[in-house]
Amino acid sequence: MTRGRVIQVMGPVVDVKFENGHLPAIYNALKIQHKARNENEVDIDLTLEVALHLGDDTVRTIAMASTDGLIRGMEVIDTGAPISVPVGEVTLGRVFNVLGEPIDLEGDIPADARRDPIHRPAPKFEELATEVEILETGIKVVDLLAPYIKGGKIGLFGGAGVGKTVLIQELIHNIAQEHGGISVFAGVGERTREGNDLYHEMKDSGVISKTAMVFGQMNEPPGARMRVALTGLTMAEYFRDEQGQDVLLFIDNIFRFTQAGSEVSALLGRMPSAVGYQPTLATEMGQLQERITSTAKGSITSIQAIYVPADDYTDPAPATTFSHLDATTNLERKLAEMGIYPAVDPLASTSRALAPEIVGEEHYQVARKVQQTLQRYKELQDIIAILGMDELSDEDKLVVHRARRIQFFLSQNFHVAEQFTGQPGSYVPVKETVRGFKEILEGKYDHLPEDRFRLVGRIEDVVEKAKAMGVEV
């Protein structure tokens, strides 16, 4: 093993000088291990990742944990390989940090477990699968208007506190319960409390045995937040490539991946780009996203929560992510304020899969008619606000009448929110969703009170609620 010495520490960035002309390769992992010799020192067990060759036998590295206690002159060892993490069955039901070390107090990973490097090339063109298959989520607004593709990339857009994490939790629940699929959850720069809650909820619901979890949370240095998405992706790739599984990869939050990159970029000596982001933003994003795909062996379907800074969709971070996505689920604060959950904007959310040759003619026509009705309602709202409903034509009154029922029927109760709402969650198959909206558009339920359509699953639940109110059905 080749040894070097720390010559400079700048926050999370550490410069190391090596001896005898040896230079570790880019992305190699370096180790610093130091036992405290007195009470003023701390034990150090730190991993660094090589980012730049500066010349003069010196490399600039990014720390994967806090650099507290580091001093110049400390010994550094080149491990000769990139960071590698455990993969396979041993990861299921466990929680890891960026280095693949378990952090759930459930014991160590077996020493003979397979470990894969977190940096690998994307699958070759000839290995990719080309057929398009829909992934049923059981969430009406998603399945009807912006369906997810197996092996696709889906973005969950929204500002702070509109329900991104709850939607992700529901998707994990539904995929595990209804499809029996394996999920990998990468918590990138989000709240530790949320990660802890998610872990315990998944343990209680029995979903944890089908899930591997990796966390690099808000309190951790940018190096950990930058690389933790790759750790999760490496675990997911094993299930796809070696076991031929269809894997779900959840990343919460992909914006923090970009944010962590921008934090270290200036310290690495790069000139900032637009809005202060790193000049390598598109490259870094591409290296991550191109590994998430369907191959002839299996697929990785990725659902990424994307924080939109100040609700500005032109910000370079969300804008760069957009170009990689097959579907977007936009969460709208106005809908959350109206009590419509999930607060998915039915007009702004899009999917490449909403085409008659993929979802079928009936589904496509119903979805487009729903969007048409909601768009017309949106246009009429200004007139209603100024002149009132009475000034509308009979045709427009009917549009408003049905649009409000559609808007409420796009909401539903979630299994993971049962403890807050006291209402049982609902999983609605795509066929039932299409049938329900088709019947609303045909005017079959025009006589039922609109508030009965709120937070229900199937159309039959609306009828039951109306009956309970004493309405003649």
Swiss-Prot record:
Binding site for ATP: 158-165
Membrane topology: Peripheral membrane protein
Domain of life: Bacteria
Coiled-coil residue spans: none
Gene Ontology cellular-component terms listed: plasma membrane; proton-transporting ATP synthase complex
Keywords of the record: ATP synthesis, ATP-binding, Cell membrane, CF(1), Hydrogen ion transport, Ion transport, Membrane, Nucleotide-binding, Translocase, Transport
Protein name stated in the entry: ATP synthase subunit beta
The organism of origin for this protein: Geobacillus thermoleovorans
